[in-house]
Amino acid sequence: MYVTFNEALDSSFGNLESPNHDFKVGDPNMVPTPPMDSDSAAISLAFLISLSITFAILMLILVVIAAYVTFCGDDESEYDEENALGTRTSGTLHSLFGKKHSGILLDSSFASPGGFDDEIVLQERELEELPKMSAYEVELYIRAKEFQMMSPPMVKDFGTYLDSDDQQFIKDRGIQSYFLLPSINDNIDEYGNFLPSFIVQDKLDIQFSKFNKSSSTVMNYPLPHNRKDAVYFEVKIFRHIQKSNSIFSIGLTTVPYPYFRVPGMAKYSIAYESTGKLRINNPFTASTLLPKLEEGDTVGFGYRYKTGTIFITHNGKKLMDVTQNIGIDLFIGIGAFNAAYTRTYTRDGLLEDPDNVSFREALSEGKDIEVAKDLQRVHDPHDDSDEMTSDEVELHVNLGQVGFVFIEANVKKYAFGSVYGQIGIPPAYNGTEIKKDTILQKGEELPPRYADTDNFFGSMKVKEGSSSRITAQTSKPLWSVGTYERISSNFDRENNVYHDSLETDDNNTDNNVNNNDENAGCNENSPLLEDDGNKRPENSNTPREVSDGAINKNPRNKSTKKRQRNRGKSSKKKNRSRK
């Protein structure tokens, strides 16, 4: 039982004043017990009230910050999405290519929703940039806008594009299941022949032809989830001459993507251009942030699953992390176009490009500017007399079927999957497995005995039917090759007559017999005519008598000869009797 300090003090003084108690001095080391507050409920209530007030103030501060970021983010519009050295750091570049809470990918026309009207800004940008383009560039820009209005891009969460059948096929076949889609553009000549803009070889090797004006292709399947930290692919520049009039782009896109537009120039696409420009949904002027690509270079793109980051490599060295918070299915995209049909990449456009400092310095100093011959002026692709052939470009895509130039991708296994999938490699047909088979080896030691016949299929005979007059006899002599070719055609047998063939018509035979009767006297004096008219060569036969390389003697010919001979003898006897 605890008592208060005042009660203890009154009790001690009372003991001193009482005569019935002796005075006792207490222990000097003894410390009096401090008083305790018995009202603990009041203290707990005050503590809870103060804690609630603190949390309320914190929540109010967070709400104010969220409202400010949401409705007062106009400063994002001042940032150039292509220039990482602008007013903001390169780490915030992902806000231009990020996605909303609903999973929709934002394009480069706006940075934060609700900040301003993106359509008005886009119209202002078009009024500024379109006059700087050629007629062909404006045509492609309008076609791309109409294409994506009619066929909106499929912006889906990562891993939701494929169905169960496609996923099983990829597991079975591995990298062998991936391929680039073929050319589907509308280039034809005056005769209607298809002129492909590019040719896909061995599924992953693409070659842009001389007929290419502006085209692109995508992979048949999106980036896979290989159960690693990231997925990665590389593109080897196998052929690209210096001062080429062809410009190509390598990157990632959504589908469907305009087949006549290179990656990076339409919505929901990012690309590394061969000129060194980095394009993110930008068909207008872009800044040069990357090295220019030459023949023999290797460009790589990687995607990290956890952070949604896209990074770019060049010749095995990582250059930069381009975007973050990407959570949609993306496809590999490759495209190329003829720069001679554009104003952006011809002489006038190159001089206006702020990144071409050397051109402006040379122009100010009065020096000659080295520009390719095809890029001196803008050409018209719709004019046959002004049409230019494109320089060929050949690119090879590596999904992991061979080693990467980027060492980290090899060590951490960033490939698209196994080369041959769960089915494995196909069997070898070079004979090494056959040599190990005991039964097949025994069969080689004891070859089968084939029948000794006239030909490979043995002795073949054709049975003679009721309406057939042909009997195959392989033992008889064959016709010559030339004669056999002439009589082997139905048309020749019915319409053409050769000097070494005989007429088999009965009417012709009767006519010959009548002529012999009328000219019997003449035949006696001219035996040559008699032989020619009455006797046939022994080795000559009609086409009807030849079949399957065999020669048949028609019994009708024998009877005809006998009648001719008998009539000849009778005519001779009559002449003698008259004499």
Swiss-Prot record:
Region entry Disordered, spans: 499-579
Residues that bear Phosphoserine: 358
Name under which the protein is recorded: Protein SSH4
PROSITE patterns named in the record: B302_SPRY (PS50188)
Glycosylation: residue positions: 212, 356, 430, 507, 557, 575
GO cellular component: endosome membrane; vacuolar membrane
SUPFAM superfamilies: Concanavalin A-like lectins/glucanases
Species this protein is from: Saccharomyces cerevisiae (strain YJM789) (Baker's yeast)
Subcellular location: Vacuole membrane; Endosome membrane
Membrane association type: Single-pass type II membrane protein
Lumenal side: 66-579
Transmembrane regions: 45-65
Record field: compositional bias (Low complexity): 509-525
InterPro entries from the UniProt entry: B30.2/SPRY (IPR001870), B30.2/SPRY_sf (IPR043136), ConA-like_dom_sf (IPR013320), SPRY_dom (IPR003877), Ubq-SigPath_Reg (IPR050618)
